[in-house]
């Protein structure tokens, strides 16, 4: 199970590193223009808009790109604590992406990548939690007097 969790973590990390880099660096002119147009739409329905904050689309794209790039890298090569933090940040980012697509009333096929990534990140998070708690709860040596067994 640990090998499959490691493989999932590395694959997700590489995926988010590449998508973050694509948002930050011009891959090609048509792709960059399409991404700019998308982030203009995304900025219009930004979740904190109800509180009076609406980001600049270019800054929004850069912030999401850096978050994906750094969190993806940390997911692959970071220490366990930073892997966990980056996983949580990516979960929050994907929840925001799904929210944005729902508000924009996009087609179902547009939701699929965000929902799949969110599901895989949640699976990784819950499995890592189970592995940590299973290791912490396991007691190899019986302690005399523990759990109601009187000492003799």
Swiss-Prot record:
Claim: Cell membrane is one of the keywords in the record: no
Family: Belongs to the DoxX family.
Location(s) in or outside the cell: Membrane
Lipid bilayer topology: Multi-pass membrane protein
Transmembrane region(s): 62-82, 85-105, 111-131
Alphabetically ordered keywords of this record: Membrane, Signal, Transmembrane, Transmembrane helix
Any coiled-coil regions, as ranges: none
Pfam families linked to this entry: DoxX_2
Signal peptide: 1-21
PANTHER family for the chain: SPINAL CORD EXPRESSION PROTEIN 4 (PTHR13163), TRANSMEMBRANE PROTEIN 35B (PTHR13163:SF2)
InterPro entries linked to this entry: DoxX, TMEM35A/B
Major localisation: membrane
Name of the protein this chain belongs to: Transmembrane protein 35B
Cellular compartments per GO CC: membrane
